Amino acid sequence: MTTTLTLRLPDDWHIHLRDGAALATTVPHAARAFARVICMPNTVPPITTATQARAYRERILQALSDSKIADAEQLLARFNPRMVLYLTDQTSVQDIVTAANSGIVA
């Protein structure tokens, strides 16, 4: 008996999309290959709060929306970038609670 497992669209649990102009290249490639991605927060400056994570996620989705690729609209409908915080000595418990309650932080 043959059993098969088909991954229709995998997830990437450790991706570095970078920021700024690089998003125009990295985001469309990631959106075509993956359904969900966990975006590493080690940008410059690092993503350390829920507010920064939300802004970074918006830049990621905007980069996909602004891309000139033909299937950008379809990709936007299914691409789900999940955010994490870069923890530092200054990260407060409240920062973590706020991020956890934001709905966008993995």
Regions found by a protein language model. Give the residues of each.
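Alpha-helical structural signal in soluble globular domains
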Residues: 33, 59-63, 102
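Alpha-helix-loop-beta-strand connector modules within alpha/beta enzyme cores
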Residues: 54-68, 72-76
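Divalent metal-dependent hydrolysis catalytic cores, especially in the metallo-beta-lactamase
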Residues: 13, 27-52, 75-88, 104-106
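Metal-dependent catalytic neighborhoods of phosphoester/phosphodiester hydrolases
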Residues: 48-56, 93-94
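Extended substrate/RNA-proximal surfaces in nucleic-acid metabolism proteins
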Residues: 91-106
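Short beta->alpha connector loops
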Residues: 19-22, 87-91
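Structured loop/turn residues at beta-strand edges in well-structured enzyme cores
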Residues: 5-8, 32, 102-103
